[in-house]
Amino acid sequence: MLVLLISLVLSSVTRAEQMTTRDAPMATLLGFFDALSVENYPHSNMQDWVTDDFLIFEMGQAFSWDDFAAFLAEASYDTWVSTEWRLSEARVSLTEGAAHISYVNRGEFVYPDPDNPGQQLKESNMWLESVYLINEEGQFRIKFLQSDNVSRVVESLP
């Protein structure tokens, strides 16, 4: 009976540790999207969320962080009104020192219409995404983000 009780206690401690461990990569992913939001961009601590050799593969192109920041500047990201990402169906896999997360990302953006001054557009997207994170000095950071757009709807706001 004592052995069974000890086994149950150890099992719950292991599950609690596993949940905490799985929460750390998700916290990094959510922190990245928070730092990327127009309300916080450019975020002075983006390097807290990505590695020095970070790579994002989006729209059929590979971008380093500096390349992606230049792409955002070219898209006049600093004039956008709002950005929102809703992540769901996250699957977290852990290995020693690394994590992989696959998830569905639904995003909604409001920004000025580049072809019609004074008009705003609302863009709704759904992506299937995957990130690879590594643990650097006790902190998970995103090394690679793969994004495949599943749907995109753009509408003019009244």
Q: Model segments located where?
A:
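Beta-strand residues in well-ordered beta-sheet regions across diverse protein folds
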Residues: F57, S102-V104, K143
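Short beta-strand edge/turn micro-motifs at domain boundaries
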Residues: H100, S124-L157
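Short beta-strand segments enriched in hydrophobic/aromatic residues
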Residues: V50, N105-G107, Q146-N149
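Short, low-complexity N-terminal intrinsically disordered segments enriched in polar/charged residues
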Residues: L2-W49, S156-P158
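A solvent-exposed, acidic/Ser-Thr-rich amphipathic alpha-helical stretch
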Residues: H43-T95, L121
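Short, cysteine-centered beta-strand-loop-beta hairpins and adjacent loop/turn segments enriched
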Residues: Y77-V81, G107-K122, R152-V153
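Short, surface-exposed coil-to-beta transition loops
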Residues: E84-L87, S102-V104, K122-E129
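A short hydrophobic beta-strand element
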Residues: E96-Y111, M126
